[in-house]
């Protein structure tokens, strides 16, 4: 084989030996004609021109010189863009998530065919009318079409009938010609079938494979196929051969993955442009980073975007106030050139005339079709706001996606119909439209909502939930088709089907569940619930297929359990995470000293693949150079966005410690949450401002930042602290208490809005409002109190103090459960008085109420046996229920939790021992009570169940039996065994209990040395350790549903949706939270039995 000679300035390229399909076939890059059967098939062919020359210096690109991107789109049905994109969803997975880059490539490929195909772009912009049939010279360029060789039977070479059908007849002879060479290079039949999408690449890969591997040694067969099957794949591979060496060197120093990404997504022109302009792009005044160059180039039209960035970045930054990062974000999409030019033209108009912010304009422009979306916003924003009642923020949300133009036009047309005829709200219509393919989803909701509700029993809310994702149209149609099958044949519930469908790629996930559920259950021993849990994420299809393939390997070769495999797979990017665990688990354990459990913990989050790779790379650096422990590194990595958090810790830890006086432990506490990267950056920026201008301490700033959404909470404190203190009479301490929880931003905004209403109209005090708001989910709790307090007080006879106590312990869910019970009494709770119900709700939240509803096995007999063992109801045995509620409420409302214990002794006239004993009975250790760090109600309930004699085993999150029901059955069995055993003396019980008082909270207040014991599932106890306990009253109640584009940075719309899409955290066990909570003695068991129904009806439902 002749060697590939180096690139020369000559426009002609030396031909490779062998066939040159790139130069004779219209499907090659040289652009004779579009694919057969394409929408532009009849348009005249464009004169063939050489495209091998190096890009010229920055100047207006000629690629669209005859018309704009929108002119191109007008040449054919606009729906082609969306249909092609969404029909490519089987491989989409998570297109906007770093966890699934391969899926993004498929979107690029789909868009290339539908939106901006290089061979047809220049045809579409010509002024000549289309011909009725292809030109004769186009046929002349394909002698193989009429050749008998086109009828070759590839099955003789081992291809299946299905594989042969995927290969176009005219390409089969080329496949046969290069089959032997490609197989010899290690390509499979499936690889060759994929490569045949671009026939020119078959010969190129067959002839130059060894050269490709020498130039790109890390490239896999899949990588080569991924580049080769694209429109300019053959020439892109040739360009990599000649230019990879220089691109690997300064100033870009690109790695193999980056080179392949540019070639795969941007094509040959992007590779050539990056090579030609590498010095200009990275030097002054642009100063782009290699990652930014790759991001811009790795798109359709990447070469034009690079040219436009060189021309417009200085203008947009200096004249329009954008940042270089914003310019890069706009350019890093298909059509980036047009989007940048439109931003330059429309940004002043949209901001001055329509009231948008530059950030909103950037958000709209930073998508495929950004140019058209901006123009449509300019045209329709007044109409949608004035005539349809939408807000500018809602219009921006709709426009800020691929296909935003079509979505806005469809909202204008269908919003009245969907609201008036189908009962949807404008917010629901906006939610459906605010995704790629929003137009098609809205039209499908209009068509299928009546059918799904009437024929299949779904609710409108469920239909909206399915439609409000990428691929909503296809998901709705698939639910209509498969819901009966999955329920009747596979035993799923409609709710489970809806949950699977309510993700990006829901269609493919449902079809894969139908296909693989029997296999995974029968062959691999998974439960249907576990299969649903894996499927119930973006990329569920790929995750299920990977579990089928890797579960035996991971269990047999690496010692993982099926539950661990399921936990890894049950996240966005689960497919990639599983493959990375298989690859890196031995390395991380042997070379870095991690345990398999730690590896699983890191992988069991969105973006687990990237987090594992970053731990492998940065763990030695963070430990040796920055003094962190491996446990601290694992804790940071074990969150959504762990990769970014680790990299930011490496970068900012010295700055935050040296310049701002934080400790490494505080930096870890901030980073150890979803969105840790953003929180760290915001602390660096706002800590001086909050301390100097607002009087906060660094400890308070750290407390606010050490939660999911810490960035937003800090920014909201900066904005609202003066307002809440001056206008509403709160203290800075109270503002910090509200902000120092997950969802602190939303809680602060809700306090600002509802505090006057709750105080003036409902008679609450500001202290009570703060107590309700100072928890995870404070926003929802406040809104629920506003809605249900009149009902509970007027209709059911509760006092406002009782309502506040329920809301401060169990939140929104406990309040709704109490209302449901009082309105429609459940037989299992009918024997309880209102005081009993309130006490139970304060003690264990909704999990406790639900547990009693589901029934305590053999409860009447157990209660009778306890009464026989301890016949006297002594005063120290049964506490007054109202008293328990008052004590809990006192602690929850105390503005200085660390002083609450001493104040409570005075307030209630109790001794230290008596108050500690009361708290022990409600699942609080003495040390927690002394420092005011009461655990969440759900955690206290778990402890009570354990202390009652149950050996707590962490259930699978997808267990078929609910945790509460399983807990109660085990509790009953254990309690019965205890009662049958010989009775120890009461003093012995007390001694035994005292000797075992070693709760997790004991460790939680001893200092940083124990902070990072590997309990990554309980972040509220990790980060608490570096802060005064008065700031760390962590009582999570709810976890907000819905995927976030940037993990851990929720926006208002995401958290607002939590009122309708809520994943219950109450019922989930707190891993390790009660591992060593001391067992109850008989007096305490009797006290617990007094809290539960004692009539025979308790066991009636067992």
From Swiss-Prot:
Q: Which cell locations does it reside in?
A: Secreted; Host nucleus
Q: What is known of its domains?
A: The central DNA-binding region is composed of 23.5 tandem core repeats with 1 base-specifying residue (BSR residue 13, also called repeat variable diresidue, RVD, residues 12 and 13) each of which recognizes 1 base in the target DNA. The BSR is probably the only residue which contacts DNA in a sequence-specific manner. The activation domain activates transcription of a reporter gene upon expression in planta and in yeast. The 3 putative nuclear localization signals seem to be highly redundant; only mutation of all 3 knocks out the HR.
Biased composition (Low complexity) is annotated at 141-151
Any idea which UniProt keywords this protein has?
DNA-binding, Host nucleus, Hypersensitive response elicitation, Repeat, Secreted, Transcription, Transcription regulation, Virulence
Segment Disordered: which positions? 1-68, 127-151, 978-1021
The record's principal subcellular location, in a coarse class, is secreted
Q: Core repeat 15. repeat positions in this chain?
A: 798-809
| Family that this chain belongs to | Belongs to the transcription activator-like effector (TALE) family.
- Ranges for the region named Activation domain are 1063-1093
Intervals holding Core repeat repeats: 288-321, 322-355, 356-389, 390-423, 424-457, 458-491, 492-525, 526-559, 560-593, 594-627, 628-661, 662-695, 696-729, 730-763, 764-797
Motif Nuclear localization sequence A (NLSA) positions after renumbering to this chain = 951-954
Please describe what this protein does: Avirulence protein. Induces the hypersensitive response (HR)in rice plants carrying the resistance gene Xa10. Activity depends on the presence of the core repeat domains; replacement with repeat domains from other proteins (AvrBs3 of X.euvesicatoria (AC P14727) or AvrXa7 of this organism) does not elicit the HR. Probably acts as a transcription factor in its host plant (rice) to induce plant resistance or disease.
Amino acid composition bias (Basic and acidic residues), ranges on this chain: 978-990
Task: Output the Pfam families linked to this UniProt entry.
Answer: TAL_effector
**What's in the GO CC field?**
extracellular region; host cell nucleus
Name of the protein in its database record:
Avirulence protein AvrXa10
Which organism's genome codes for this protein?
Xanthomonas oryzae pv. oryzae
Motif: Nuclear localization sequence B (NLSB); annotated at: 997-1000
> What positions carry the motif Nuclear localization sequence C (NLSC)?
1034-1037
For the keyword Transcription, the answer is yes
Q: How is it used?
A: By combining the central DNA-binding domain with the catalytic domain of the restriction endonuclease FokI, TALE-nuclease (TALEN) enzymes able to target specific dsDNA sequences can be created that enable eukaryotic genome modification. Other potential uses as transcriptional repressors, for transposon targeting, DNA methylation or histone tail modifictions are also possible.
Determine if rRNA processing is one of this entry's keywords: no
């Amino acid at each position: 084989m002749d060697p590939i000679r180096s690139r020369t300035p000559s426009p002609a390229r030396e031909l490779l030996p062998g066939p040159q399909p790139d130069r004779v076939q219209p499907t090659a890059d040289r652009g004779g004609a579009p694919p057969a059967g394409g929408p532009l098939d009849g348009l005249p062919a464009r004169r063939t021109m050489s495209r091998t020359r190096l890009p010229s210096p920055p100047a207006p690109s000629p690629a669209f010189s005859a018309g704009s991107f929108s002119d191109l789109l007008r040449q054919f049905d606009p729906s082609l863009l969306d249909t092609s994109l969404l029909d490519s969803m089987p491989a989409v997975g998570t297109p906007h998530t770093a966890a699934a880059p391969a899926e993004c490539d498929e979107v690029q490929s789909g868009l290339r065919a539908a939106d901006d195909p290089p061979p047809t772009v220049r045809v579409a912009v010509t002024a000549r009318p289309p011909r009725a049939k292809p030109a004769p010279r186009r046929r002349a360029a394909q002698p193989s079409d009429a050749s008998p060789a086109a009828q070759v039977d590839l099955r003789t070479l081992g291809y299946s009938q299905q594989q042969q059908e995927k290969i176009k007849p005219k390409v089969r002879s080329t496949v046969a010609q290069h089959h032997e060479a490609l197989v010899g290079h290690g390509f499979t039949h499936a690889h060759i079938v994929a490569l045949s999408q671009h026939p020119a690449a078959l010969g190129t890969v067959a002839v130059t494979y060894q050269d490709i591997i020498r130039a790109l040694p890390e490239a896999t067969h899949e990588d080569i196929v991924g580049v080769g099957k694209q429109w300019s794949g053959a020439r892109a591979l040739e360009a990599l051969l000649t230019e990879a060496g220089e691109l690997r060197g300064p100033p870009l120093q690109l790695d193999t993955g980056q080179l392949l990404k540019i070639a795969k997504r941007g094509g040959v022109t992007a590779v050539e442009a990056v090579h030609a302009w590498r010095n200009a792009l990275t030097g002054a005044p642009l100063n782009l980073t290699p990652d930014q160059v790759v991001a811009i180039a790795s798109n359709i039209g990447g070469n034009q975007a690079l040219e436009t960035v060189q021309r417009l970045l200085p203008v947009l930054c200096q004249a329009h106030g954008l940042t270089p990062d914003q310019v890069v974000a706009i350019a890093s999409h298909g059509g980036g050139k047009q989007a940048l030019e439109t931003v330059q033209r429309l940004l002043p108009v949209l901001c001055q005339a329509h009231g948008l912010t530059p950030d909103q304009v950037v958000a709209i422009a930073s998508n495929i079709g950004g140019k058209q979306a901006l123009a449509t916003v300019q045209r329709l924003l007044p109409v949608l706001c004035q005539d349809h009642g939408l807000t500018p923020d809602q219009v921006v949300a709709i426009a800020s996606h691929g296909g935003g133009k079509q979505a806005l036009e469809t909202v204008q047309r269908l919003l009245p119909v969907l609201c008036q005829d189908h009962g949807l709200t404008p917010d629901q219509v906006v939610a459906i439209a605010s995704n790629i393919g929003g137009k098609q989803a809205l039209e499908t909701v209009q068509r299928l909502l009546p059918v799904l509700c009437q024929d299949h029993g779904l609710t409108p809310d469920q239909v909206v939930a399915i439609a409000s994702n990428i691929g909503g149209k296809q998901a709705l149609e698939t639910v209509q088709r498969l819901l009966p099958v999955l329920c009747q044949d596979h035993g799923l519930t409609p709710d489970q089907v809806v949950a699977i469908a309510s993700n990006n790629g829901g269609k493919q996930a449902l079809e894969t569940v139908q296909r693989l559920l029997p296999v995974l259950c029968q062959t691999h021993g998974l439960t249907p619930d576990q299969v649903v849990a894996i499927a119930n994420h973006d990329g569920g299809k790929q995750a299920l297929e990977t579990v089928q393939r890797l579960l035996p390997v991971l269990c047999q070769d690496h010692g993982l359990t099926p539950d661990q495999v399921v936990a890894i797979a049950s996240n966005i990017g689960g497919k990639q995470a599983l493959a990375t665990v298989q690859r890196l688990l031995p390395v991380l354990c042997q070379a870095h000293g991690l345990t398999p459990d730690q590896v699983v913990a890191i992988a069991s989050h969105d973006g687990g693949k990237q987090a594992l790779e970053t731990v492998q790379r940065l763990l030695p650096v963070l430990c040796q150079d920055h003094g962190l422990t491996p446990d601290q590194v694992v804790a940071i990595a074990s969150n959504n966005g762990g990769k970014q958090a680790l990299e930011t810790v490496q970068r900012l830890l010295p700055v935050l410690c040296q310049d701002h006086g934080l400790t490494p432990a505080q930096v870890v506490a901030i980073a150890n949450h979803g969105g840790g990267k953003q929180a760290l950056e915001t602390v660096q920026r706002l800590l001086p401002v909050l301390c100097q201008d607002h009087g906060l301490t660094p400890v308070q700033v750290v407390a606010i930042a050490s939660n999911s959404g810490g960035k937003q909470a800090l920014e909201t404190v900066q904005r609202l602290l003066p307002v809440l203190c001056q206008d509403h009479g709160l203290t800075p301490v109270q503002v910090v208490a509200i902000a120092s929880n997950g969802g602190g931003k939303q809680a602060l905004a809700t306090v600002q809005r509802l505090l006057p209403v709750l105080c003036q109209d409902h008679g609450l005090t500001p202290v009570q409002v703060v107590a309700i708001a100072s928890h995870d989910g404070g926003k929802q709790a406040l809104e629920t109190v506003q809605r249900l307090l009149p009902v509970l007080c007027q209709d059911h006879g509760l006092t406002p103090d009782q309502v506040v106590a329920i809301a401060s312990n169990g939140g929104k869910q406990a309040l709704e459960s109490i209302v449901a019970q009082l309105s429609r009494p459940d037989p299992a709770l009918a024997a309880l008085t209102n005081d009993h119900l309130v006490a139970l709700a304060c003690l264990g939240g909704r999990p406790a109420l639900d547990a009693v509803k589901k029934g305590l096995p053999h409860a009447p007999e157990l209660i009778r046996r306890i009464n026989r063992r301890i016949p006297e109801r002594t005063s120290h045995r049964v506490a007054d229920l109202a008293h328990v509620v008052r004590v809990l409420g006192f602690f929850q409302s105390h503005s200085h939790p660390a002083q609450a214990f001493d104040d409570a002794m005075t307030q209630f006239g109790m001794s230290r021992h008596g108050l500690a004993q009361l708290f022990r009975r409600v699942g609080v250790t003495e040390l927690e009570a002394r420092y005011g760090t009461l655990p969440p109600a759900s955690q206290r309930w778990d402890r009570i169940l354990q202390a009652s004699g149950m050996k707590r085993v962490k259930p699978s999150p997808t267990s078929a039996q609910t945790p509460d029901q399983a807990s109660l059955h085990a509790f009953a069995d254990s309690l019965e065994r205890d009662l049958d055993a010989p009775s120890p003396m009461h003093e012995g019980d007390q001694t035994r209990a005292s000797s075992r008082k070693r709760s997790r909270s004991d460790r939680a207040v001893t200092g940083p040395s124990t902070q990072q014991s590997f309990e990554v599932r309980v972040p509220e106890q990790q980060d608490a350790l570096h802060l005064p306990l008065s700031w760390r009253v962590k009582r999570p109640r709810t976890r907000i549903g819905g995927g976030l584009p940037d993990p851990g940075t929720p926006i208002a719309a995401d958290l607002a949706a939590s009122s309708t899409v809520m994943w219950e955290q109450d019922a989930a066990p707190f891993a390790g939270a009660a591992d060593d909570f001391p067992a109850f003695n008989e007096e305490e068991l009797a006290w617990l039995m007094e809290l539960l129904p004692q009539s025979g009806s308790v066991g009636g439902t067992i």
